[in-house]
Swiss-Prot record:
InterPro entries: Glycosyl_transferase_4 (IPR000715), PNAcMuramoyl-5peptid_Trfase (IPR003524), PNAcMuramoyl-5peptid_Trfase_CS (IPR018480)
Gene: mraY
Membrane topology: Multi-pass membrane protein
Protein name: Phospho-N-acetylmuramoyl-pentapeptide-transferase
An example Gene Ontology CC term for this record: plasma membrane
Transmembrane segments: 9-29, 53-73, 77-97, 112-132, 154-174, 182-202, 204-224, 231-251, 257-277, 305-325
Organism, as annotated: Carboxydothermus hydrogenoformans (strain ATCC BAA-161 / DSM 6008 / Z-2901)
GO molecular function: metal ion binding; phospho-N-acetylmuramoyl-pentapeptide-transferase activity; UDP-N-acetylmuramoyl-L-alanyl-D-glutamyl-meso-2,6-diaminopimelyl-D-alanyl-D-alanine:undecaprenyl-phosphate transferase activity
GO terms of biological process kind: cell division; cell wall organization; peptidoglycan biosynthetic process; regulation of cell shape
Amino acid sequence: MVITKGVTALLVSFFVALGGGRVLIPWLLKLKIGQTVRTEGPKRHLKKSGTPTMGGIIFLLSLVVTVVVFQAFDAKTLLLLITTLLFGLLGFLDDYLKVVLRRPLGLRAREKLLGQVIFSLVLTFGAVAFLGRGTDWYIPFSRLLLGEPRYLELGNVFFFAATIFIMVGFANAVNLTDGVDGLCSSVTLIVMSFFAMTSLALKEKGLFIFALALMGGLVGFLVYNRHPAKVFMGDTGSLALGAAVAGFAVLTQTELFLLLVGLIYVVETLSVIIQVIVYQLTGKRVFKMSPLHHHFELSGWSENKIVLVFSLVTLIMVLISGYGL
């Protein structure tokens, strides 16, 4: 019954996103809300200049509609939905400043960081104070290897600090991954399948509906976002997806699994950090360009090949992680 309801939610969300895209994309084109492509990026990206952005609205709308239709109003689901939408709103403001008000850098870095920290606190405090979330992390594979689940106790201070770091870190990591047509949406679609599986195992019906609804919305969005993309998700979508991924982990005590299922996000972020540090110290670059997907682009990989390989890596990590629950 729960699985049937979840699959139905996925289909509803898919069709809402499909219809939403048909309405939103022409409207964005009419308003000339198009992405400005950086000249220092891969040269073949220059032809994408003017492609509508803020497309994250498509799958966020389908998510909200589906959650309401299926009345997934339990406290955990609502807290995750609110946090996801708050991050999406922050991304929307950033996109709006960039493409509508023509402020190239959008929100200032400190403004964006402050908003992310505050919204992360909303989820963290809500989970601990109102949902009875403990300050421990489930240790992956402990049930499989030791016969019983084991947890790593962090204590209040470290738990809050670590959770905020995870929320902010993954919001920005997912944002970094959004640099190739269909990449971020494809990888996150597969990551969400892990959290759907986790929610089902924990009998969290609301979170299960949320995960399937977001998956359906992403499939619908991919119809327009696959190469060659007719729309980009923008920070509106990528920050929201990052918050959803990290928020799911916090609410299901699976934070450590993010290193596995979110491997692509982690590697993309590390490639940027390594590139900056090595260049500042030696004046040389480790990668042709960072994040990592741009390195592969400049190495001759097509966008479709990058999406396929990164998605397969994510799928493998999700399958492995399933045994660790």
